[in-house]
């Protein structure tokens, strides 16, 4: 810690960078591989999710698409503990708390793989979840949607469930077709926790646009 303190200068990140920041982000970008050359650091997962949404919103405003303001997430899901990320999370217990308060997202079924409604199998439920995602996009209007954020390994809300590979390919196709950002929330499963540095690396044909 003393050595780090001797190296690290204070610099407001929107104005300048310091050498430890440069070294760390370069290392993360190298491990993340092609397509993930840009890195933004945050103090935790909740803030990181908000940074991702702010980035996507800024992109669409800058490219003349300010009408894109809807965010899609899964039910159930968990994306953080701030007002914004709780609103993004799919937890029915929060319904009375929010009731129009804060930032909320439109929910679609999570691609669960166990304890499924009969007569579903993991394969049929994955297709059901994909159909629901497409239907919600059409309901809102494809040109009004910012992004679809999901957990490639379910966390607090779903008990570490892992969707089928075909589901990832399906959401990638849907998001690409509608020019919607696909965001993987890897706060639980990223940085080597499942073997590869990014869990997204298990799905080379369905890589997300942003990994948190």
Give a label for each model feature.
Residues 1-212:
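Conserved N-terminal phosphate-binding loop of PLP-dependent enzymes in the Aspartate aminotransferase
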């Amino acid at each position: 810690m003393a050595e780090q303190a001797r190296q690290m200068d204070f610099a407001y990140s929107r104005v300048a960078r310091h050498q430890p920041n440069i070294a760390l982000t370069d290392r993360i970008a190298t491990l993340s591989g092609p397509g993930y050359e840009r890195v933004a650091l945050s103090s935790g997962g909740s803030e990181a999710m908000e940074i991702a949404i702010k980035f996507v919103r800024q992109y669409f405003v800058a490219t003349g698409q300010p009408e894109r303001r809807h965010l899609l997430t899964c039910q159930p899901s968990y994306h953080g503990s701030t007002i914004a990320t709780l609103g993004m999370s799919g937890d029915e217990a929060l319904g009375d708390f929010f009731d129009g308060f804060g930032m909320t997202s439109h929910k679609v079924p999570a691609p669960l793989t166990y304890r499924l409604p009969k007569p579903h199998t993991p394969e049929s439920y994955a297709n059901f979840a994909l159909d629901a995602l497409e239907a919600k996009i059409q309901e809102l209007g494809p040109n009004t949607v910012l992004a679809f954020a999901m957990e490639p390994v379910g966390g607090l809300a779903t008990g570490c469930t892992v969707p089928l590979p075909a589901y990832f390919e399906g959401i990638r196709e849907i998001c690409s077709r509608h020019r919607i950002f696909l965001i993987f929330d890897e706060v639980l499963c990223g940085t080597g926790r499942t073997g590869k540095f990014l869990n997204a690396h298990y799905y080379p044909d369905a890589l997300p646009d942003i990994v948190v």
